[in-house]
Amino acid sequence: MTVFSNTSTQDTKGTVYVVDDDDAIRDSLRWLLEANDYKVELYDSGESFIAKYDPNAIAVLVLDVRMPGMSGLEVQEHLLARKADLPIIFITGHGDVPMAVRALKKGAVDFIEKPFQQAALKAQVEHMLNEARERRMKNERQSLNEALLAKLTPREQQVLERIVAGRLNKQIADRKSVV
């Protein structure tokens, strides 16, 4: 297992997991992504990635389809079984249409053939990390709202229900004997 990471203020931008059995591809992607201030974690196999994957990270996965051991499609299946919220960009030197269709139907966001256009990959990574950050903020707001609602007394919940139903303050006060 080979794991490299570059930690700094890049954590706020998000993490790019790169899983590929080809050293040259991993190094090339690390160079490209770190030059654009991303935190990059490199893995040489699906198994090593699965062992270290942090489901709480704001991240995107750049994943080779064909690797010895666990294939990229098997990694995707494993992540789906864990209900991981992780955008996957597949890269491959030997892809075919049925393979791409299968990956995309299972939720992959892109399927790119090697050699790939660096600008296109970088743009897709940026787009997916932005979406991941937005989803995280939305989920955090929803959790906060649910926690606040759970703290309401039964009477406060009834008042809130009437407000949501469009009742006027005066109508709510009359019904609840609220002054």
What are the language-model segments listed below?
Residues 96-98, 112, 116-125:
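C-terminal output helix
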Residues 143-179:
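Helix-turn-helix DNA-binding segment
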Residues 1-17, 23, 30, 144:
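Non-catalytic signal-transmission and effector/linker regions of two-component phosphorelay proteins
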Residues 56-62:
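Active-site beta3 strand of CheY-like receiver
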Residues 65-67:
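Receiver (REC) domain active-site loop signature in two-component systems and cognate sites
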